[in-house]
A protein has these predicted regions:
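Thiol/disulfide oxidoreductase modules built on the thioredoxin-like
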Residues: 125-133, 138-189
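Conserved redox-active cysteine motifs that mediate thiol-disulfide chemistry
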Residues: 74, 82-99
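Short pre-active-site segment immediately N-terminal to redox-active cysteine/selenocysteine motifs
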Residues: 76-78, 82-86, 152, 162
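Short, ordered coil/turn segments that flank beta-strands lining enzyme active or ligand-binding pockets
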Residues: 17, 63, 161
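Structural recognition of the beta-strand scaffold that forms the well-ordered cores
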Residues: 81, 111-113, 135-137
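Structural microenvironment flanking redox-active thiols in thiol-disulfide oxidoreductases
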Residues: 91-129, 140-146
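N-terminal targeting signals for export/organelle localization
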Residues: 1-57, 192
């Protein structure tokens, strides 16, 4: 009996000792400290499980603050990127989305929709960058994010000219890298 009690006390001491040790969490880099994504590190997960689904009919703000819906973009394929100013991978992939928007302007519309809660915050962040092609849309209620049902930023969805989903990438991506080029060539080539 004494041996059992000593064994039990020893086990408790080990367990309690383990609970007392707290590891210091590794700090996440600030969004402004993240560099342009490297292909292997920022290879978001390709998801085709929503292929053929219609664009969500939610309303958010265009770059001028007017009400806007994705349905206004039908007629040409559109790549919709959900992002936020505080999201490191989002910020890292933004320059590559800007490059893509310029290179594919004739075949593809690219819009970036911030999930931040303030137009002033997004506009202030945007003013410090020199994007040539992209303009910041805003979904402060996160309605588009909820419609996409990923819970992850960045999330990027490609819709065909009829407004049907082709695929989505959940997580960061180098949008002017070889993987993105292959995905887009297959999708856009099939629509010509």
């Amino acid at each position: 009996m004494r041996l059992e009690i000593l064994g039990l006390l020893g086990s408790c001491a080990v367990l309690l000792g383990g609970c007392d040790k707290q590891s210091t969490p590794t700090p996440q880099p600030k969004a402004d400290e993240v560099s342009t994504p490297a292909e292997p590190e920022q290879a978001g997960k390709l998801d085709i499980s929503h292929r053929g689904e219609a664009m969500p009919s939610v309303v958010f703000e265009d770059p001028n603050g007017a009400k806007f819906s994705l349905s206004e973009l039908r007629g040409k394929p559109v790549l919709v990127n959900l992002w936020a100013t505080w999201c490191g991978p989002c910020v890292a992939e933004m320059p590559t989305l800007d490059t893509l928007a310029g290179c594919e302007a004739e075949r593809l519309q690219v819009i970036v929709v911030s999930q931040d809660n303030s137009r002033a915050l997004v506009d202030g962040w945007w003013a410090k960058r020199s994007f040539k092609q992209l303009k910041p849309y805003l979904d402060s209620k996160n309605d588009l994010g909820f419609a996409f049902e990923t819970g992850v930023l960045p999330t990027t969805v490609l819709y065909d000219a009829e407004g049907k989903e082709v695929w989505r990438v959940v997580g960061g991506m180098n949008w002017d890298g070889p993987r993105a080029n292959t995905l887009l060539a297959e999708a856009l080539g099939a629509q010509q």
